[in-house]
């Protein structure tokens, strides 16, 4: 992942979720964890129109071993994380994933269900059930965002769980951090993949 010559190697992660699921927060925590993990350039940004609960939202995390000088994210990401699998029918999610990329979904289904003709790796984990099990529920809403950070760590190998846990701890009070870290760990352990994924040359 180190830079070669003058070219910046930037890893692009796109988050797809719905308003209220915490996708933007997850993107920001991942950026912070990547920085803790030693990446020199990190950014996180949301993309949505009128934000309302339940409406589709998109957020991006970008990180690089060298400072990021290109502000515009690439059209296709190395990793796409989907907080609500029903969005697969509502949004062209695969259109924003590189042909050899990694798709991570909050789903109780096996990863093979989401395999396509594209040469992608697929990872699934039932973050919703795990979040409910550990008590990540606020006003009836199950908070799955930090759980999927655990799935990201296991499936991608790009950011360590240790760094994710440190970033989570910096964003929540001690009691909430403990619950979120437990959810992330359990989701990490429960993550299933159709095959091992390795990062190819990331684009700018």
Regions found by a protein language model. Give the residues of each.
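Active-site cofactor/cluster-binding pocket
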Residues: 2-204
């Amino acid at each position: 992942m180190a830079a070669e010559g003058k070219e910046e190697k930037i890893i692009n992660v796109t988050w797809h979720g719905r308003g209220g699921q915490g996708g933007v927060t997850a993107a920001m925590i991942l950026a912070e964890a990547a920085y803790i993990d030693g990446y020199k350039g990190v950014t996180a940004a949301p993309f949505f129109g009128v934000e309302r609960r339940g409406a589709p939202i998109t957020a991006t995390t970008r990180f690089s071993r060298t400072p990021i000088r290109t502000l515009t994210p690439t059209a296709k990401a190395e990793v796409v994380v989907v907080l609500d699998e029903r969005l697969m029918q509502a949004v062209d999610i695969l259109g924003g994933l590189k042909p050899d990329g990694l798709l991570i979904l909050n789903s109780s289904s096996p990863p093979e269900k989401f395999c396509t003709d594209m040469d992608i790796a697929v990872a699934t984990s039932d973050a919703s059930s795990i979040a409910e099990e550990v008590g990540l529920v606020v006003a009836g809403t199950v908070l799955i965002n930090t759980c999927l950070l655990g799935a990201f760590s296991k499936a991608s190998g790009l950011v360590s769980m240790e760094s994710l846990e440190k970033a989570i701890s910096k964003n929540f009070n001690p009691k909430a951090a403990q619950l979120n870290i437990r959810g992330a760990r359990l989701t990490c352990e429960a993550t299933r993949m159709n095959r091992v994924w390795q990062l190819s040359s990331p684009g700018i």
